[in-house]
A protein has these predicted regions:
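Active-site-proximal cap/lid insertion segments
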Residues: 39-176
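Catalytic-site neighborhoods of secreted/periplasmic enzymes
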Residues: 1-62
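Catalytic core of tubulin tyrosine ligase-like
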Residues: 179
């Protein structure tokens, strides 16, 4: 069983039914969008591949953005990178970015809990990654660290592979194409 509940605006022509078992809807900007997955549809004995796309930094554009933040970032404690001017507009931009991370963290927890509640977590490997940095100069569309250094977390709940010490950080180069 395969599913993708996010956009799949790939740069090639394809038939979505050849890639995913799940139905989809058409979005005017992003092409095809998968429908939200109900983890109870998956069983312990059925292998699956799923892609769950989170809004990430784009949460700030949603009307209820502020309502979803449990503890807003203290703007007075934000330290901007040395190459940026200490400007209230930039501080607010960074604060909203950090606030959006809280929402992403909550959504990831909901996914993990959904897998756990449906007794399929122990048979799952979760890959968490981002496509680019935040939407600010020297990030997202630029070949600087802010646009290239994105999170990659692999959590093996199956315990089938060589364990890596919890909290281990690795700075080796990984290509998103490999994932």
């Amino acid at each position: 069983f395969t599913f993708n509940n996010g956009k799949d605006d790939y740069n090639f022509s394809y038939n979505r039914h050849n890639l995913y078992s799940q139905e989809y809807k058409v979005h005017p900007l992003y092409g095809k969008l998968g429908l939200p997955i109900d983890f109870s549809e998956l069983t312990q004995k059925q292998p699956f591949f799923g892609q769950v796309q989170l809004s990430g930094g784009k949460e700030i554009f949603k009307k209820n953005f502020q309502n979803n933040i449990s503890s807003p970032v203290d703007r007075s404690k934000i330290k901007l990178p040395p190459y940026l001017p200490n400007n209230p507009v930039l501080i607010e931009e960074y604060a909203k970015h950090y606030d959006a991370i809280q929402i992403t963290d909550k959504r990831v927890g909901e996914i993990i809990n959904g897998l756990k509640e449906n007794k399929i977590l122990n048979n799952t490997i979760v890959f968490f990654f981002s496509d680019h940095g935040m939407r600010i100069t020297r990030n997202k569309q630029f070949l600087y660290d802010g646009g290239l250094h994105v999170p990659l977390i692999i959590a093996d709940f199956t315990n089938q592979f060589k364990p890596i010490l919890k909290g281990t950080s690795n700075s080796e180069l990984v290509s998103g194409l490999d994932i």
